[in-house]
């Protein structure tokens, strides 16, 4: 702990003098101005474009944002769910809204019923509401995959008070394949160690920096006790979790969670409804739920990134915006490779 404290102090001091300026990470607000592209049709690396619907459905992004803002203001937990929904969609079959498909006679086990998604994944009703509004305004124009991407961006903006607001390229098409087994194969569980996490992200074209930055989304939302109790995180003799947090969690979680008895707990007890860099301070203080969270201190590279994100104002929000756009470009379907669903829950 003494060595970690020294590392924290040293890196914070170094960054305040040199590296933040050298990397162009100022202390200003990276919000809606923020240096990100203006909403005009600007190509992105995945064949997508910022402002994709400017001509075909000029109010598309405003419609989605209005629905998301209303939902998140009523229940901040839905915002956390929408951010997670984008991650869980993109890591399976790419960012193609495959996670939204309901079970059918032909496909009884789609992604949304896979253990990593059911019953914890949420926000589906917000996507439905946005799709209904868009179909009324611009029938058959805006894909469900783009709605998921816009909703993840807009939830980030609301929960961060505008500090993580950014342009989101669009032009995705919706996929027709959804498999529960694929979700199990590609979604990294909270029990993963650092090498497993790194490999999982690399398989989707994301690097270690993306891993550290996107893990920061655990600063909002709740988790089922079953996501960490079985990994020994509450074992006082073996876990590196802060004993005070572990004791609190033991009072909230059953020793052996079941489907009928699996409460949820806050992922960040300090600022639970705010998308901010508090997560990284929690990691340093060992006030995190998952093995995958604690794993960020297991290498010098990731530990240094945790320290910088924790102590440099505005740095994480800028990184998060870029990482979200990168993640939302995973294996996208464009043109004839997909469709634009009329109903996000079923293929056309």
Language-model segments: what does each one mean?
Residues 2-348:
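Catalytic cores of secreted/periplasmic or lumenal enzymes
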């Amino acid at each position: 702990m003494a060595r970690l404290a020294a590392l924290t102090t040293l890196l914070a001091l170094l960054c305040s003098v040199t590296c933040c300026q050298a990397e162009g990470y100022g202390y200003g607000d990276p919000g809606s101005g923020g240096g990100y592209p203006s909403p005009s049709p600007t190509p992105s690396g995945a064949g997508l474009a910022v402002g994709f619907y400017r001509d075909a459905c000029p109010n598309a992004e405003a419609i989605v944002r209005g629905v998301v803002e209303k939902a998140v203001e009523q229940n901040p937990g839905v915002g956390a769910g929408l951010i997670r929904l984008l991650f869980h969609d993109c890591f399976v079959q790419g960012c193609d809204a495959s996670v939204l498909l309901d079970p059918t006679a032909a496909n009884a086990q789609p992604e949304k019923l896979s253990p990593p998604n059911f019953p914890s994944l949420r926000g589906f009703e917000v996507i439905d509401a946005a799709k209904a509004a868009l179909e009324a305004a611009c029938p058959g124009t805006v894909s469900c995959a783009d709605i998921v991407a816009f909703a993840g961006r807009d939830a980030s903006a609301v929960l961060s008070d505008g500090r993580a607001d950014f342009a989101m390229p669009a032009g995705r098409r919706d996929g027709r394949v959804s498999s529960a087994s694929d979700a199990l194969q590609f979604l990294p569980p909270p029990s993963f160690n650092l090498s497993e996490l790194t490999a999982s992200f690399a398989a989707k074209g994301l690097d270690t920096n993306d891993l550290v930055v996107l893990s920061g989304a655990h600063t909002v939302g709740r988790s089922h006790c079953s996501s960490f109790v079985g990994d020994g995180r509450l074992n006082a003799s073996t876990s590196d979790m802060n004993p005070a947090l572990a004791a609190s969690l033991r009072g909230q979680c059953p020793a052996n969670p079941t489907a009928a008895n699996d409460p949820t707990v806050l992922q960040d007890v300090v600022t639970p409804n705010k998308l901010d860099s508090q997560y990284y301070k929690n990691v340093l203080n060992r006030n995190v739920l998952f093995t995958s969270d604690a794993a960020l201190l297991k290498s010098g590279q990731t530990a240094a990134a945790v320290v910088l994100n924790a102590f440099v104002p505005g740095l994480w929000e800028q990184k998060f915006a870029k990482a979200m756009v990168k993640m939302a470009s995973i294996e996208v379907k464009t043109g004839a490779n997909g469709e634009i669903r009329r109903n996000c829950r079923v293929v056309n």
